[in-house]
Amino acid sequence: MESKWLTVDTKHLYGFDEAIFIQKYQKKVNQIHQQFLNQQLPDGHMNGWYSQPDQDHKGLLKQINTIAKQFNALKVTDIVYLGIGGSYTGIRAILDFLKPEQKANIKVHFVPDISAFNIAAVARAIKGKSWALVVTSKSGRTLEPAVTFRYFRNLLHKQYKQKHALRTVVITDAVKGLLVGMSNQYGYAHLTIPSNIGGRFSTLSPAGLLLAKLCGHDPKQLLLGTLTAKQELANSDLNTNSAYYYAALRHWLYTTKKLKIEVTVAYHSAYEYLLLQHRQLFGESEGKGGKSLFPTFSLFTTDLHSMGQLYQEGEKNFFETVIQVQTQFHDLELPPSDFNNDDQLDYLLAKSMNEISNTALEAVVEAHFQSNVNIIKLTLKERTTFMFGYFYFWLSMATMMSGSLLGHNVFDQPGVEVYKQLMFAKLGRE
């Protein structure tokens, strides 16, 4: 299936007949689509991410611009960002995906856990720098950002005293939660996460938009990407809706082909967090009731020298989803050797780095397919701010449909609460 911005290639799926496939899934997809639009799915009110692209963002963008100007006036060079789960993975995915085009001279230090090693390393890195603190947490009580916020807020206060408030941004609920109280008391900038947007669907809420802006990317282009995707995916027809098509393919491979694992693959290390975001969206939305695909990922060509052996000759209980970006920001030519071709690479002189990488991709797809691996290939048109917004919304729609086809509530995560209750009991929180 081909559209202007994204192509789903199914020619490396064994036994796949598109006409039979669409006939099998179309009615159920139509039903789920209408239930989603009418908020009739379990926790169906948690669809704020779907209505977000159509909203007027002038007020939010004005707030973000004000923060960016203030940080610029304060000559901020480093940002410490605190967040966990979707409030971390997605934001990191944006910045890594767009890193070659970063225009602002800002260094973002992510603190996504309570590792003393990582916290100490970031504290050393910002010592003597002009830095600011951004925290994302709806409740303000999630352990990881709460602990790290105490630590780094103390550091910020020690360095800047009362003026630390000018360098602090809280991204949280509109009216409730610990961070709201702190913001009101100390005058921190406060950006609001709508209460009907869950963490893994919140990448392009204020957290992602603010960090994108601070790093010199255009949040309007991210939002335009989501709006374009929403418009293109408004119809549930599997002949045109590529996100639903992909969701149904995953279900077909899981139920009909009995494949239990999806290995999502990309060929650039900068896409690692995009793959992690894919894993979180599907894993947290579908991992319920003992009935779900197990989403994992590999970065090629690096992992070809480890996991490549398993994929080629191991048990075929998995399928691959390969993500390729058609147009890159940059390319490089292999230069002529200054050492008389002693590395014997002159046969590559007519090829660019991207050509070599794409050739490796084609060869791996062919090799794995010959070894009975089913492969879906997703091709994104370009590596741009707009494209990230488009693909993130596309993945969110695919997640909603895929999990709903399995009969799950795609908007909750009750399993995550089990360890939290045990952990807080052991730590003594009342």
UniProtKB/Swiss-Prot annotation:
Q: What is the predominant subcellular site recorded for this chain? A: cytoplasm
Q: In the Enzyme Commission scheme, what number(s) does this protein have?
A: 5.3.1.9
Task: Identify one Pfam family in the record.
Answer: PGI
The Gene Ontology CC terms held by the record are: cytosol
PROSITE patterns, per this entry? P_GLUCOSE_ISOMERASE_1 (PS00765), P_GLUCOSE_ISOMERASE_2 (PS00174), P_GLUCOSE_ISOMERASE_3 (PS51463)
**UniProt keyword Isomerase, yes or no:** yes
The record's keywords, sorted A to Z, are:
Cytoplasm, Gluconeogenesis, Glycolysis, Isomerase
Enzyme class, top EC level, equals: isomerase
Q: Catalytic center at which residues?
A: 284 (proton donor), 305, 420
Under Gene3D superfamilies, the record lists: Glucose-6-phosphate isomerase like protein, domain 1
Cellular localisation: Cytoplasm
Molecular-function GO term, any one? carbohydrate derivative binding
Pathway(s) this gene product operates in, as recorded in its UniProt entry: Carbohydrate biosynthesis; gluconeogenesis; Carbohydrate degradation; glycolysis; D-glyceraldehyde 3-phosphate and glycerone phosphate from D-glucose: step 2/4
What catalytic reaction does the record list?
alpha-D-glucose 6-phosphate = beta-D-fructose 6-phosphate
Top-level taxon of the source organism: Bacteria
Q: Does the keyword Nucleus apply?
A: no
The GO biological-process annotations, alphabetized, read as: gluconeogenesis; glucose 6-phosphate metabolic process; glycolytic process
Which family is this protein grouped under?
Answer: Belongs to the GPI family.
Q: What does this protein do?
A: Catalyzes the reversible isomerization of glucose-6-phosphate to fructose-6-phosphate.
- NCBIfam families named among the record's database cross-references: PRK14097.1
Quote the PANTHER family the UniProt record gives: GLUCOSE-6-PHOSPHATE ISOMERASE
| Protein name in UniProt | Glucose-6-phosphate isomerase
Species of origin: Mycoplasma pneumoniae (strain ATCC 29342 / M129 / Subtype 1) (Mycoplasmoides pneumoniae)
Taxonomy, top ranks, is: Bacteria, Bacillati, Mycoplasmatota, Mycoplasmoidales, Mycoplasmoidaceae
